[in-house]
Regions:
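Aromatic-enriched alpha-helical interface/lid elements that frame and gate functional surfaces
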Residues: 1-38, 369-445, 449
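A short glycine-threonine-serine/GTX helix/turn-capping micro-motif
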Residues: 3-6, 295-306, 328, 360-361, ...
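N-terminal helix-loop segment corresponding to the beta1-alpha1 unit
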Residues: 6, 29, 66, 98-324, ...
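Terminal low-complexity tails and localization/encapsulation signals of metabolic enzymes
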Residues: 10, 14, 18, 33, ...
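Redox-cofactor-proximal catalytic regions of oxidoreductases
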Residues: 73-96, 186-218, 276-285, 371, ...
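Conserved Rossmann-fold dehydrogenase catalytic segment
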Residues: 262, 292-301, 323-339, 360-365, ...
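Mid-domain beta-loop-alpha active-site segment that forms a flexible
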Residues: 301-316, 335-343, 387, 391
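Oxidoreductase and adenylate-handling cofactor-binding alpha/beta cores
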Residues: 308-329, 341, 345-353, 396-403
């Protein structure tokens, strides 16, 4: 029974104490080495400094040495990707007006122009235009070996923007696990899979068959970019490493995004989102002050989302680079570095001071109040902040004249000193009120406030509905499905969407016929031989 994931979930209260007892026998380093040696995702819960000093991070050069006029010699995070073995050089924070571009007078018009901005404008307007009105990326083709969330989220962004994303899978042991998320044995009915794979084409090929790799090579020859978020050694084993791809198409843009990158002593580590969050120091910081056992963290897989967004940006940049430079690129995007990039100030603080920053919960050093307050009902909350005197005065007037005149809260410094007392007063006020009523009243007074919404709240949110972000569709396989729309809107470019489920292998023959150029006879023979499975 314990081999069944659903059974383990149902009996977590029994399993977790046993795991804690076992793990407690080892140091962090010992248990990491033991479990990683067996292919089990396990990493230490690092502090920011622990992450910055990790041998893997140092060997990859993520923490770059810089010299700043104010701080002197220190380190700060580099960009979280490596292009053709090189990182983009890090520039320190500019001093005020230190990067003001020299101006010049245009000989054509006599106008005074900014030299750098003019050059950037010229660069930005060069390059091919979209081939039709189906989105700004119409005409771009991506072959994607993605699965679960990080890769699919990035390629969904590309697909929403008009790119032709062809998702590679196989019914012979290579299906995206999200196809079965909460649905049992049917690979074609998971709403979670639909959310992160809509607008894509599903292509199946059996790479265990001798003809499978040549078929993929013919498809890749028609692509602009290839990406994957597999473990670091997978693509080499199946004959799809960058050197092999370049033989198929010399100017291919190839992005790889394993958990800890493609180089470094820990590149072979098995990871999932929660491991990466812990490895980078984010889990350590995600806590209330003084609480260290255990860190609270979050079940939201932030590494997947932030890596997915960066993946989309870098793919677009890589294709633009190829069009201008007439050569491809190999891009190593480490999900761990993409995540650590989110806490850059904490990493810089640790590097500059030699002291680890500590968790501060919901507090802010620049705003009081700044917290999450309980409201009427079961687990209902409202977040309230006051960043300046105007907002504080408006909030204090709502709380009552006694609060507005209380000397403990007169200035921001006073409120910082008496933060706990103020939070208690606000909590007493919010507890008897509906969270949405609290938000509405404070917003009308100009005080930043927002309800901690549930999934159901979001699907009924009037603002999201008014903007067309909440979409209800009737899917032939799933029935009525509520999905989030794409968060960007373009005034002069239409985004054409396909909301039907990307059925496993549905588009294989059409892609081979219309993209690769295979004849019907060839496709029929490949199907008969078991290649297209």
């Amino acid at each position: 029974d314990w081999l069944n994931n659903l059974y383990r979930r149902a009996h977590a209260d029994e399993l977790n104490p046993a795991v804690e007892s076992f793990v407690g026998q080892f140091t962090m380093a010992e248990i990491t080495e033991l479990l990683q040696g067996k292919g089990i995702p396990c990493v230490p819960v690092n502090t920011p400094m622990g992450f910055a000093k990790d041998e893997h991070v140092q060997q990859r050069g993520f923490m770059a040495a810089v010299e700043h006029a104010g701080f002197g010699k220190t380190k700060q995070p580099a960009m979280p990707f490596v292009i053709d073995g090189e990182r983009i050089p890090v520039k320190t924070m500019p001093l005020l007006d230190s990067w003001r571009a020299p101006s010049y007078v245009s000989p054509e018009s006599g106008e005074k122009r900014d030299r750098e901005s003019s050059e950037l404008t010229l660069a930005a307007t060069s390059g091919p235009a979209p081939s039709s009105g189906n989105g700004p990326l119409d005409g771009m083709r991506i072959v994607s070996f993605d699965h679960v969330l990080a890769g699919p989220y990035g390629t969904t962004i590309l697909a929403e923007l008009g790119a032709d994303v062809i998702k590679i899978e196989s019914s012979k042991g290579g299906m995206d696990p999200f196809r079965f998320f909460g649905t049992g044995e049917d690979p074609n009915v998971s709403p979670r899979f639909l959310e992160f794979n809509r607008n894509k084409r599903s292509f199946t090929v059996n790479l265990k068959h001798p003809k499978g790799q040549p078929v993929l090579h013919d498809l890749i020859a028609k692509a602009d970019a290839v990406l994957d978020n597999y473990s670091v050694d997978v693509v080499e084993r199946i004959g799809l490493g960058y050197d092999q791809l370049c033989k198929v198409k010399p100017d291919i843009v190839n992005l790889r995004m394993p958990g800890l990158g493609t180089t470094g002593p820990k590149r072979y580590f098995s990871t999932v989102g929660v491991n990466i969050t812990a490895f980078t120091g984010l889990t350590y910081l995600w806590n209330h002050p003084g609480v260290t056992n255990p860190p609270i963290g979050s079940q939201t897989v932030f590494p997947d989302y932030v890596s997915g967004v960066l993946c989309a940006i870098i793919i677009i940049s890589g294709v633009l680079y190829r069009d201008r430079q007439r050569k491809g690129a190999f891009i190593d995007l480490a999900q761990s570095e993409a995540t650590a990039f989110m806490i850059g100030p904490s990493l810089m603080e640790a590097a500059a001071s030699g002291i680890d920053p500590q968790p501060i919960g919901n507090a802010s050093p620049a705003a009081v109040p700044h917290d999450c307050y309980p409201c009427k009902g079961d687990d209902r909350w409202c977040v309230i902040a006051a960043e300046n005197e105007r907002q504080w005065t408006a909030l204090a007037n709502i709380l009552g004249s006694a609060i507005a005149q209380d000397a403990r809260f007169k200035t921001m410094s006073d409120r910082l000193e008496h933060r706990a007392e103020l939070n208690a007063i606000i909590s007493r006020w919010t507890k008897s009120q509906d969270a949405f009523d609290v938000m509405s009243r404070l917003q009308q007074a100009g005080v930043p406030a927002g309800v901690v919404q549930t999934g159901e709240d979001l699907t009924n949110d009037p603002q999201l509905k008014a903007r067309g972000f909440i979409v209800e569709v009737n899917n032939p396989r799933l029935g009525r499905v509520v999905l989030p729309n794409f968060p960007l809107q373009f005034a002069n470019s239409k985004l054409t969407r396909r909301w039907e489920f990307p059925v496993l292998g549905k588009d294989t023959e059409a892609v081979l016929r219309n993209v690769v150029g295979y004849s019907d006879e060839t496709i029929k023979q490949l199907r008969s031989d078991g290649v297209l499975e």
